[in-house]
């Protein structure tokens, strides 16, 4: 099947005006933490928010757009992705203390800021409430998009407002009241005039309580130590693969089914944490997805519970994207 080349895709824009980096046929295994998957037809790293808006305004409306951060919660199928993948972590990484007083402080973090960096930044300014973010391997944009959380805390517990950008390159400021937020789920409240389905987070303001620098830093260190002991950080993975079902833990159910160490090719259910699937060498996305399917079917057959994936699975099966 013929696919548009880079020149035809960008025919509506003078690429000399773009200040970011635009590439074609980009291997996505370079950009996802599983280190597996196919190619992106086009790949763009914007220079800043203004450059991103310019790119989106002129990108063909019938061509898909996928936004990523560190790619830590993402599986790109081996057939790759049509359209364009836009990465935010390299440039949309502003991090600043907006205000601070006796009642706490307000921090702004761009979508590309790693969650652990935000946790450390808050601790260094004697603010508490963001320590749990040190346990999340992705970026602020991804954490906002899925209401990432751990140890009983969730991202949107701390959000005061956010900025977003849509397919037309329009940047808006929004509040939590504009969203339906739940466990690992965030959805923009729709109105009759909401005709743009693609809206992405570009940053957020986080309201935190006053704390003590050393106690917050110690909490971050404790959490990171726990991650090292309980998670297979020595292998490429995407973090927790499945959401925890109500009243239970996905890892316990998977282990109960005897699936720790279960392997297909170079993809394996971690022997350290059963809710992790690791790449032991040169795993393909299809091998990883086959394990996901096997785990879901085994747990459902044994318990009646159908595990829901926490990771996003996108792209085309097999083949390659030109």
Curated annotation (Swiss-Prot):
Active site, UniProt feature: 184, 240 (proton donor), 310
Reactions it catalyzes: UDP-N-acetyl-alpha-D-muramate + NADP(+) = UDP-N-acetyl-3-O-(1-carboxyvinyl)-alpha-D-glucosamine + NADPH + H(+)
Any Pfam family the entry gives: MurB_C
A GO CC annotation given for this chain: cytosol
Gene Ontology molecular function: FAD binding; UDP-N-acetylmuramate dehydrogenase activity
Keywords carried by this UniProt record: Cell cycle, Cell division, Cell shape, Cell wall biogenesis/degradation, Cytoplasm, FAD, Flavoprotein, NADP, Oxidoreductase, Peptidoglycan synthesis
Cofactor field: FAD
Lineage: superkingdom: Bacteria
Record domain FAD-binding PCMH-type: where: 36-233
Biological processes per GO annotation: cell division; cell wall organization; peptidoglycan biosynthetic process; regulation of cell shape
Pathway where this protein functions: Cell wall biogenesis; peptidoglycan biosynthesis
Enzyme Commission designation: 1.3.1.98
PROSITE patterns: FAD_PCMH
Gene3D superfamilies: 3.30.465.10, UDP-N-acetylenolpyruvoylglucosamine reductase, C-terminal domain, Uridine Diphospho-n-acetylenolpyruvylglucosamine Reductase, domain 2
Cell location: Cytoplasm
InterPro entries membership: FAD-bd_PCMH (IPR016166), FAD-bd_PCMH-like_sf (IPR036318), FAD-bd_PCMH_sub1 (IPR016167), FAD-bd_PCMH_sub2 (IPR016169), MurB (IPR003170), MurB_C (IPR011601), MurB_C_sf (IPR036635), Oxid_FAD_bind_N (IPR006094)
Its biological purpose: Cell wall formation.
UniProt similarity note: Belongs to the MurB family.
Protein name: UDP-N-acetylenolpyruvoylglucosamine reductase
Organism, scientific name: Nitrosomonas europaea (strain ATCC 19718 / CIP 103999 / KCTC 2705 / NBRC 14298)
